[in-house]
Amino acid sequence: MAINQGKYKPSICAIDEVDDRSFKLHNSQDEIGGKQQLQQIEGSETAPLTTNQQKLHMDDGSHLTPKDLEAARQDALNEVAAGGAGGRTPAAITPNSTHPSANGLRALLLPGRRSFDALMSLSRKRRILYVTTACLCALLLLIIILLLAFWPEVPFYLRAPLCLDKECVESSRQLLLWANTSKSPCHETYEWACGNFASDYANHEYFVIKRGEWNYETYNEYQELNELNRFIAMLPNSQEGSVESTVSSLYRSCRETDVLDKSQSDLLLKRAINAVYGWQAFRDSNRLQSWEYKRVLVVLQAKHGIFPYYRVTVENGFSNPHDYVITLDEGELGLPDKYFYGNDADEEVVRGYKLLLRDFAINMGIVSREADLFADDIFHYERRIVNHIEDAKADANRPINKLMRLADLKIKAPSLPILESLQAIFPKTKITEDTEVLVRDPEVMHALSVLLSTSDKKPINNFIVWSLARKMLPHLSKEYRTLAETFDHALYGRTASYPRWLICSKVVRDWLPFAVDALQQQPPRQQFETMTSKSRGLNKTQGNEELLKLMFFSLRNQLKDSLEQAKWLEPAARQFIQKKLNEMRLQFGIPDEVLQQPTYLAQYYNELILNNVFFVEHLEWIWTFRRSQMEKKLGPLAILDVIVSEMYTRDNPQAIAYSNKLNMLLVSKVLISSNYYDYRYPVAVNFARIGTDILEALIDNFSTFLLQFNTQSTDISDAAPEIRYAQPDVNCLAAGQPPRLVHELNELSSNALKSFHVTLSAARTAARALSNFVNAIDAGSAIQGSGIDQANTYEALGLTRRLRIPGLRSFNENELFTLSYMQQHCSTTIADKDYARIKPLVESQLAESYLFNATWQHIQFLPRSTNCAAAEATCSNLL
């Protein structure tokens, strides 16, 4: 057998063993006596080849027969066998054979070499496949290692438990209904909070019906009236004279107004005008020869409850024990604010008002030329009244809110028949010249007296007749109602007519508020709710009241702390207000003792008679009933009667009101049983809604507290702390706004500026109270003044769970508060009227669009809660 070693042909596969061409051969025969090392020069062509090299680099064997190849293979096998039989194994002779560590390394690398040899023995395509797979696996392993090393921490809100209760889902639905959380709260704040508000209004049943501004308040009012309409429809048929029948009868009579035709309306108007001894514009009148305005004013006030020059009410006095006292203030005018009688007034509103006056006269049969004169005379006479009042208020040092004997007031204002009016309005009360009354502004009474004494009978007669007709117009036939709606278009913007069910539901609520709330708060309904919810612990009414108590004490405590920081209030005044807050109590709805008396409600409305043929005639009887309730307040009342009187004898009963007589916060149960508030809603949502409502009711009465302090203290001058307190820094609040806005804010009435101050102060205080409330829950500490077992109460109300709500899972308490509060200022106006500019003059409240921007700019908590930049400086005169 011949193996051609001299013709060694290197190939690509020879690299597997070229790196170790030097080796040692151990002579088995000389192994005992000594080892002869034979070292070959690495890379020489004479170096013996290994077995694998021999296999890979032998000649193609064209001159070798298969028999020669087989013989060579057999020789190799025999050689190996012989070495094994003789106890000797051929060993490679290497320079490092004497070092065991090197041999160990070679032994370790030997399996890798064999794997590599096996890989090289494969075909090229299979080698590429295996190498690619190995690279991909290595890359995948590297990616996994990098992901494990740099994987971000899972946010808390994704790990926090999610609340899936019905109330949590409902609160989320309410917030997401108007919000567009895909927008940036820092750069697109309104779109973030109210992005879907306008589109929801466009799809609402109230679309183009609400006059002026559709906002959160009007949205809730619509929901309330809609529920009341359904409630009235479900009232059972009761016997004649019951409260249920009175409510149903009033509602039906209101719905039937459309059957009244113009001739009947003319007859009703003329009958009412004859009751005030005629109108000089009628041709058949006696041309005012025997007409006496003092006698007419007494009839107009006592019979119809209309107060054209001075207004009579019964309010709380400023001296302890804050008993009721007859109060006199300036009277009513045709336009909503004195601004509209100025030289720079809104021309569209003035033109609409004159058109209303003119069309009324024409409908009453007055020819066009005289109707135009009538309109001009009324407007200019009302302007004279405004000018006299403003001149009287020019002196900032004049006395206000002064108790005066009627004899002294008669000397001050001899042309006003005040004594005669009071004797007619309160016939069961002894009214004499020694009776003391509270006069809001004695100088205004004097100015009005001068005006009457210097006016002719004709403008006085026109003004009194118009005051009577203006109150009747909305309840007459369609021809007269259209006149009032046309003026509303000039004032609020062009809208559709209110649906009749909405008007009548509002009439029932405003005229019979105690009956409506009492029927909705019947004990049988509560007992049924308690029985059905007993197995689940607290029912909604109980839970709402318990949480509201905690919120009230938390808000009160924060309000006291905010007062401590109000250095713009004198220390003695701050202490007085804090004392009032410490002694304040809380009342939910009508007392249970009242509802448990089966005859209380019937006796309350015993004097109300609604048996008239036409709805407009109810006006007189409703006023007679209200007048009797006012007179009862002048006598001794039981505590239950005082609570009912404080809640329902106001001109506009509020769901949350403060009683100066009782130093008590009154919260309607209708409100706390609605979807506006629920103890299972997130705490932040409740603080942003009903929490700010409570604070606004309290802060709004701080001016009254200061008047009480003025009356009871001799250390404070008559510098009218109410005015200083209620006036915010207009220049600061309007910083960064157009100059026109600064001018408009300075032109606002004190009531409008006061509401602005109240809104901002309430929001800031509520945000701080929320933080303290949440910290108290986390720490398990009690709310100061609440007097509760905090551990059981917090657990029963579910306050310790701190669950996230669906759809807003990433929002913490502060962000939820911000979103909920900002949505209270969502609004949209009628397209053809810039109502935002005149809203403060019409409603004594700033437009919601401005309040939205002002609260975001001047309440630092709101932008900071959403990680937005906030102004560091704060405006003065804010809590």
UniProtKB/Swiss-Prot annotation:
Topology, Extracellular side: 149-879
Disulfide bond entries: C163-C168, C186-C868, C194-C826, C254-C504, C732-C875
Domain of life: Eukaryota
Residues glycosylated per entry: N180, N539, N701, N853
InterPro entries: MetalloPept_cat_dom_sf (IPR024079), Peptidase_M13 (IPR000718), Peptidase_M13_dom_2 (IPR042089), Peptidase_M13_N (IPR008753)
Tissue: In late third larval instar ovaries, detected in germ cells but not in somatic intermingled cells and is expressed uniformly in the wing disk. In the embryo, expressed in the ventral midline, tracheal placodes, and cells forming the anterior-most row in each segment.
GO biological process: negative regulation of stem cell differentiation; oogenesis; proteolysis
Chief location bin: membrane
Compartments in which it is found: Cell membrane
Cytoplasmic side: 1-127
Keyword annotations from UniProtKB, A to Z: Cell membrane, Differentiation, Disulfide bond, Glycoprotein, Membrane, Oogenesis, Signal-anchor, Transmembrane, Transmembrane helix
Peptidase M13 domain ranges (all copies): 162-878
Signal peptide: none
Protein topology in the membrane: Single-pass type II membrane protein
Disruption phenotype: Increase in the number of differentiating germ cells.
KW Chloroplast (keyword) present: no
GO cellular component: plasma membrane
Pfam families cross-referenced by the UniProt entry: Peptidase_M13_N
Transmembrane segments: 128-148
Function recorded in the entry: Plays a role in the ovary in limiting the number of primordial germ cells (PGCs) that develop directly into gametes, allowing them instead to enter the developmental pathway that produces germline stem cells (GSCs) from PGCs and ensuring lifelong production of gametes from these GSCs. Negatively regulates epidermal growth factor receptor (Egfr) signaling.
Family membership noted in the UniProt record: Belongs to the peptidase M13 family.
Identification of the protein by name: Protein gone early
Organism: Drosophila melanogaster
Gene label: goe
